[in-house]
Regions:
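Bacterial Sec-dependent N-terminal signal peptides
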Residues: 1-20
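Compositionally biased, low-structure terminal segments
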Residues: 7-12, 76, 81, 143
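Short, flexible, glycine/charge-rich loop motifs used to bind or transfer phosphoryl groups or to couple energy/partner
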Residues: 14, 50-51, 187-188
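Accessory carbohydrate-binding/adhesion or oligomerization-edge regions at the termini
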Residues: 17-117, 197-207
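Accessory beta-strand-rich segments of carbohydrate-active enzymes
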Residues: 28-31, 42, 46-47, 61-65, ...
Length: 207
């Protein structure tokens, strides 16, 4: 009986520890409120001419942080002022626009290998020693017109490296990680007529 109780308590402790991990260090979580993957039915050459596709490419407000603890945690709120922030081109890698450091490694991990954690303390010579998990906070706006009423609206990201949270008008829509595949979210219930605020928080590394 004592062994069974001990085993139960041990499993409970492990489960509680897993629950405390952020989504981007939790191997159980790879997406929240994402649409199922599906085939792309619109050819890239036709997207420009499609009236039902609105591109959000362009200049977004942006702030880069060396690690999650230094990010502006409330930036997604509607009353958060980003007027003093820089602007960044989307799509685009922030490392090629003056933020952080480009790293290419097909052998070594760019962070301390301690799965599923990506923020464990690495050797002092690692770039990630002083930049545990660089985080980008992005904000833009888009318009919803009356003719969109009664239509389902989806937010489509063609690739984000490597994990992100998404908010629309201050409400959290979902989470995704998988930098080499698209991510889609149904934002129909989050939008309103007129100007809408989109906030995206991107983490450079995830489990």
């Amino acid at each position: 009986m004592r062994k069974k109780i001990f085993a139960f308590l041990l499993l409970s402790a492990l489960y509680a520890g897993a629950q405390e991990a952020p989504d981007w260090e939790n191997p159980i979580v790879v997406g929240i409120n994402k649409e199922p993957y599906h085939a792309t039915l619109t050819l890239p050459s036709q997207k420009v001419d499609c009236k039902e596709i609105i591109s959000l490419n362009g200049k977004w407000r942006f702030q880069w942080s060396a690690d999650p603890g230094k990010r502006p945690a409330d930036f997604y709120k509607n009353d958060f002022n980003t007027d003093t922030w820089d602007t960044i081109t989307v799509p685009g890698a922030w490392q090629l626009q003056g933020y952080g450091k480009p790293i290419y490694s097909n052998v070594n991990y760019p962070f301390q290998k301690d799965a599923p954690r990506v923020t464990s303390e690495p050797p002092a010579e690692y770039y990630s020693y002083g930049h545990r998990n660089p985080t980008g906070s992005y904000v833009t706006t888009f318009e919803v017109t009356p003719d969109m009423k009664d239509k389902c609206l989806y937010l489509h990201f063609e690739g984000v490296k490597s994990a992100m949270y998404v908010w629309v008008n201050g409400e959290r829509v979902g989470y995704s990680q998988n930098s080499m595949s698209p991510a889609e979210f149904d934002i129909t219930e989050f939008v309103k007529n007129g100007t809408n605020r989109l906030a995206v928080e991107v983490y450079r590394w995830s489990d």
